[in-house]
Regions:
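N-terminal alpha-helical interaction blocks
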Residues: 1-104
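Cys/His-rich short segments
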Residues: 112-160
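Acidic/polar active-site rim loop that often engages polyanionic ligands
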Residues: 105-109
Length: 161
């Protein structure tokens, strides 16, 4: 068996929720992490030979403020970030449908998680209650309004149709 199966059934990563509020641990994890970079259309900016993940050091030596911790797999940290944060232009992108046919299940699940989170972050820049500017917290898993204090969280469970 090739290791490939139905995409999105593998949960992908241990999301390690307690670590998201510990910047020093996030910074330490970044040094050996891998990052998934998505363009403004939600496509993955592949690293090389259709590899899903960039070495974090190629993206930035220090953890970028907009790097979202996706979780861990086999003690390896995985982060997501938008392509506009990069200092280089990605040469190739890959959509989620194409990735589902090329990548192992867990990588496709991580792609779906990254795409959903970065989309939510882009849509949550302003408070839904008062319109004030919201700041991302918890390594990208919550947004807090600077004006009224409303805290919102993404819905990260998969949809089944």
């Amino acid at each position: 068996m090739s290791g490939f199966g139905f995409a999105f059934r593998d949960h992908g990563l241990d999301r390690d929720e307690p670590m998201r509020s510990q910047p020093e641990r996030l910074d330490a994890a970044w040094t050996k992490a891998k990052g998934m970079v998505l363009d403004d259309k939600g496509n993955s900016c592949v690293y090389s030979n259709e590899d899903a993940f960039h070495p974090a050091a190629r993206i930035s030596l220090a953890r970028p403020a907009n790097a979202t911790l996706l979780g861990f797999r086999d003690h390896q940290a995985y982060f997501a970030m938008p392509a506009n944060a990069l200092s280089f232009a990605p040469s190739e992108t890959l959509g989620i449908r194409m990735a589902a046919g090329l990548w192992p299940d867990w990588q496709t699940a991580v792609f779906a998680q990254a795409k959903a989170l970065l989309h939510w972050q882009a849509q949550s820049k302003f408070c839904g209650r008062c319109g004030g500017l919201s700041d991302l917290r918890s390594a990208g898993y919550s947004a807090s309004c600077a004006v009224c204090g409303l805290v919102v969280y993404p819905q990260t469970h998969p949809a089944v149709i």
